[in-house]
């Protein structure tokens, strides 16, 4: 987008907002653990922290730009098209700063985005996930100020999809079709199909090789395909792309599956006319997944994964622990550690909030901890401090009897996705 009202970089105010960012999101405890080889021992409790976790540079950039925007346009109405990142603490801070969310009403309830509320005098922030081309066009016509915090890795996927489009290839996007990033990516392709996992990719490849029931195919993939998608026409030339937060290994397997499929269907000599691919998993996602694979090799009693419940990359971190057979719990903050007996967490399979009993073993314990790319160090530190508290361990390492205050009383919860 070329416009005097469009800003893709910061406003040179990072130094001015740095103190606020440090106070709200950083932690001296996390600095200590990093300096101590990502391990902290107190009393009979050992915490092993993944060597890559929490805020990635794309998230850091987006949050910093939002704070700079707040300072740059003081006195003007600021909007954001949806959550800037998938972390409740960060988004709540933005609300407290007076930034309004286009997908929320006055009471904070989720509603369809209402761009009619935006005036020419307003400022609209685009989140780290980006925005669809349709939303960009609406905002451009509003002639309002647009501050684009889209992660550069997401933009790289858009460039790849654009290349496929120009070559008249259908984009096969490994992702969740309702995720904000995938919605934005798909909007940049005339023809696309979103596959959630290797199983769905296999269904598509089986259709490419053997044909099948077109109506049944569209019934299954209808919500995940472009308007007018025709599997008999649109699966002849395909290019692989992905939501940047998906499991790297699965994206690679999906790419190889489509490559083998097109080679079988059209022959090795014609592969380039029918298949294109490029690695678009972001470095930060890969680093956190690699660190998680390393962490689960440690002798752990359990693992705590911290991140927003709608965070895709956090969910995939927990999948690694589950596949390894480790007791693991996805929480969004320290208040989910209700007591030494009870923990409230998001169940990986039901995607709902559940309560588990006897989650924290008695006696000596080793706890692995990691966090998704949208989780501030401060939240990680609060969780670690709560674990020590529940084990009766003070900052000095001394142990003693403690009470277990109930921080949350819900026995369960509604579906989270």
UniProtKB/Swiss-Prot annotation:
(2E)-4-hydroxy-3-methylbut-2-enyl diphosphate binds at residues 86, 179, 244, 311-313, 374. The active site is at residue 181. InterPro entries: LytB/IspH. [4Fe-4S] cluster binds at residues 56, 151, 282. Keywords: 4Fe-4S, Iron, Iron-sulfur, Isoprene biosynthesis, Metal-binding, Oxidoreductase. Its EC number is 1.17.7.4. Its cofactor is [4Fe-4S] cluster. GO terms for molecular function: 4 iron, 4 sulfur cluster binding; 4-hydroxy-3-methylbut-2-enyl diphosphate reductase activity; metal ion binding. GO terms for biological process: dimethylallyl diphosphate biosynthetic process; isopentenyl diphosphate biosynthetic process, methylerythritol 4-phosphate pathway; terpenoid biosynthetic process. It catalyses: isopentenyl diphosphate + 2 oxidized [2Fe-2S]-[ferredoxin] + H2O = (2E)-4-hydroxy-3-methylbut-2-enyl diphosphate + 2 reduced [2Fe-2S]-[ferredoxin] + 2 H(+); dimethylallyl diphosphate + 2 oxidized [2Fe-2S]-[ferredoxin] + H2O = (2E)-4-hydroxy-3-methylbut-2-enyl diphosphate + 2 reduced [2Fe-2S]-[ferredoxin] + 2 H(+). Binds 1 [4Fe-4S] cluster per subunit. Dimethylallyl diphosphate binds at residues 86, 179, 311-313, 374. It comes from the Bacteria. Pathway: Isoprenoid biosynthesis; dimethylallyl diphosphate biosynthesis; dimethylallyl diphosphate from (2E)-4-hydroxy-3-methylbutenyl diphosphate: step 1/1; Isoprenoid biosynthesis; isopentenyl diphosphate biosynthesis via DXP pathway; isopentenyl diphosphate from 1-deoxy-D-xylulose 5-phosphate: step 6/6. Isopentenyl diphosphate binds at residues 86, 179, 311-313, 374. Gene3D superfamilies: 3.40.50.11270, 4-hydroxy-3-methylbut-2-enyl diphosphate reductase, catalytic domain. Catalyzes the conversion of 1-hydroxy-2-methyl-2-(E)-butenyl 4-diphosphate (HMBPP) into a mixture of isopentenyl diphosphate (IPP) and dimethylallyl diphosphate (DMAPP). Acts in the terminal step of the DOXP/MEP pathway for isoprenoid precursor biosynthesis. Belongs to the IspH family. HAMAP family: IspH. This is 4-hydroxy-3-methylbut-2-enyl diphosphate reductase. It comes from Gloeobacter violaceus (strain ATCC 29082 / PCC 7421).
